[in-house]
């Protein structure tokens, strides 16, 4: 993204490298940071094609990097905005219904996901519950609190986006400014990927109206209210482990299907319509035959008189 549009326009993505192919570039960057500020020379490593937080680790020593394994390494954001002393990120859901033209819907509701240990500036590489916000990781912590009532959407370590917004407004944060910045991140990301997906659709012969996609944007807010794009998830999990999950994700799916124009299938009604259509066809065929007209043979453009 930064290679195409420049770092100034896309400075919302932490410095990121694909290993082992870009290890040389990463190593050079690591050494420069080490000279100036070793405390901020912390990186997060994610195995390629992994999900649910599997294999993620923090490193501050280049020797801990496994250069024989395909992975993504990103600079760790060391000044996250905290709520009640905990680090969090936002799962923002985005629906794409067309790429020619690009048509994107950003859902107003989503999730704020919290780390289950109190955050400190001292980096403890082994404490994933403090640094990582992945639900699949934190639910294994004995301190994890699950939301048990969707009407209380600011309880536990997973909130609704609505609860998140209300909390920040109460402490005096300009939510209009924050969302404007977050929407800018989402739209720039979509515009960057647009030509690649258009080309793929043309090669596969996929018609632009035949598909849609729900994306999950993971966004971290730092202490300066700057949104950082951590990753974009294709087909994000729709699993519901709590009433809050069910409320948000069921609404998400219903809205997505309605916007995409997917209609409910009624088997009885559909069968009746097919019978009516077939009977109407037979009636018209019989009517044409008795009138001395031409009758088209089914499945052909050959006519018999």
Residue ranges and their predicted role:
Residues 15-17, 38-66, 81, 90-91:
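Glycine-rich phosphate-binding loop of ATP-grasp-fold ATP-dependent ligases
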Residues 217-219:
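Hydrophobic residue at the +6 position relative to the catalytic HRD Asp in the kinase catalytic loop
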Residues 1-4, 11-29, 70-77, 81, ...:
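Acidic, PEST-like segments
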């Amino acid at each position: 993204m930064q290679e195409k549009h420049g770092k100034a326009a896309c400075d919302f993505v932490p410095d990121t490298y694909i290993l082992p192919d870009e290890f040389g570039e990463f190593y050079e960057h690591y050494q420069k940071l080490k000279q100036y500020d070793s405390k901020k020379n912390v990186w997060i490593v994610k195995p390629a094609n992994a999900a649910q937080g599997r294999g993620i680790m923090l490193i501050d020593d280049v020797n801990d990097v496994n250069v024989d394994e395909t992975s993504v390494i990103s600079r760790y954001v060391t000044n996250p905005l905290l709520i009640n002393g905990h680090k969090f990120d936002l799962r923002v859901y985005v629906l794409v219904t067309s790429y020619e033209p690009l048509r994107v819907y950003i859902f107003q509701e989503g999730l704020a996901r919290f780390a289950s240990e109190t955050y400190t500036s001292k980096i403890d590489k082994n404490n994933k519950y403090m640094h990582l916000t992945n639900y699949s990781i934190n639910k294994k912590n004995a301190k994890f609190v699950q939301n048990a009532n969707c009407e209380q959407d600011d309880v536990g370590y997973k909130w609704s986006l609505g609860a998140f917004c209300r909390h920040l407004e109460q402490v005096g944060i300009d939510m209009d400014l924050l969302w404007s910045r977050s929407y800018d991140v989402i739209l720039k990301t979509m515009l960057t990927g647009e030509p690649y997906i258009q080309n793929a659709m043309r090669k596969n012969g996929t018609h632009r109206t035949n598909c849609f996609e729900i994306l999950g944007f993971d966004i971290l807010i730092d202490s300066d209210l700057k949104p950082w794009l951590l990753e974009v998830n294709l087909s994000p999990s729709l699993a519901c482990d709590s009433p809050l999950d069910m409320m948000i994700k069921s609404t998400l799916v219903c809205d997505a299907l309605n916007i995409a124009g997917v209609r409910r299938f009624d088997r009885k009604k559909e069968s009746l319509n097919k019978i009516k259509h077939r009977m109407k066809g037979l009636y018209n065929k019989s009517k044409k035959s008795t009138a001395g007209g031409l009758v088209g043979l089914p499945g052909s453009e050959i006519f018999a008189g």
